[in-house]
Amino acid sequence: MSSKAIRCFSFTASRDWFYRYSFANAGLRSAATDLGDGTVMHCWVPKIPKPSKPNLFLIHGFGANAMWQYGEHLRHFISRFNVYVPDLLFFGESFTTRPERTESFQAECTMKLMEAHGVQKTSVVGISYGGFVAYSLAAQFPEAVEKLVLCCAGVCLEEKDMNDGLFNVSSLEEASTILLPQTPEKLKELMRFSFVRPARGVPNWFLTDFIQVMCSDYVEEKRELIDTILKDRQLSNLPKINQPTLIIWGEQDKIFPLELGHRLKRHVGESAQIVIIKNAGHAVNLEKPREFAKHLKAFLFDSQSSPSEPSFLEQLQKKFDLSK
């Protein structure tokens, strides 16, 4: 492929199209829901929800849209759950004209989205920033959240942690330039922060293409989301939750250090368990996808939260009425 052809062809847009195709092929459809007051949330929802199945919401973090963060994991859950994959506000096709930027508001909008699609109860998986939203959802609407998975979500951070040197950055402004990369150099820096073994030798034109497609919309609004996460944050103000909770953390997370995972476990208490994945960083869902999926399935798949798949013999008995 010539350099001119490469410039005209977007690998990122093509990958995004592939994810759209795979989500649709898995039985989901793209749906934009008007929540009122200038707020629209996009979500991948089941084409035909089955009342016999439990529900599962997969909430993404910063970075590309929700499809990119859960695309490799969707196949593990689609047969057992009614799966919903929303784009949080200012990501993908979701937006609001309202001024609120808190994870509490994101959670309220997610709850309205659930109600709009007739979902009364659900289990929730939240990655990084999505974990902040998932935690708030569980705290505000405890009757709606059955089980909770929080992956590398620094919910228990405090504003003073920045000054105390817990993070690898010294200011929110520095964090924003990394989490919202606008140059190939900053995207490479984000990759070094997110992965234990980041890809090497990625050409700048490829990184620029990714930034143009995935990182150029709602940049200022996303900066405000980051600012709001840390402002005046104190652990003493974080509400308790009682739902069964799985905490997953990359052992070498450089964005939200492992100390925050242990802090979260102590805060939630006996209803929480923590799994630490070795040789993984912040993007543990992408860096260790098999191990990540294994722990999700072990926690979410049980006789109470999902129907068991009938065996081949049971299918034969049902088809030919052999039980009589």
Predicted regions and their residues:
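Catalytic active-site module of serine/aspartate enzymes centered on a nucleophile-bearing elbow/loop
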Residues: 270-324
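Short beta-strand/loop motif that positions the catalytic acidic residue
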Residues: 241, 247-249, 253
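Flexible "cap/lid" loop of the alpha/beta hydrolase fold
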Residues: 135, 139-140, 144-182
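Short alpha-helix in the alpha/beta-hydrolase fold that links the catalytic acid
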Residues: 243, 257-266
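Conserved alpha/beta-hydrolase catalytic His-Asp/Glu region
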Residues: 159-167, 178-242
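Active-site loop/oxyanion-hole signature of alpha/beta-hydrolase fold enzymes
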Residues: 48-50, 75, 84-125, 294
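Conserved HGGG/HGGXW glycine-rich cap/lid loop of the alpha/beta-hydrolase fold
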Residues: 45-93
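Alpha/beta-hydrolase fold catalytic core
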Residues: 1-56, 79-81, 301-324
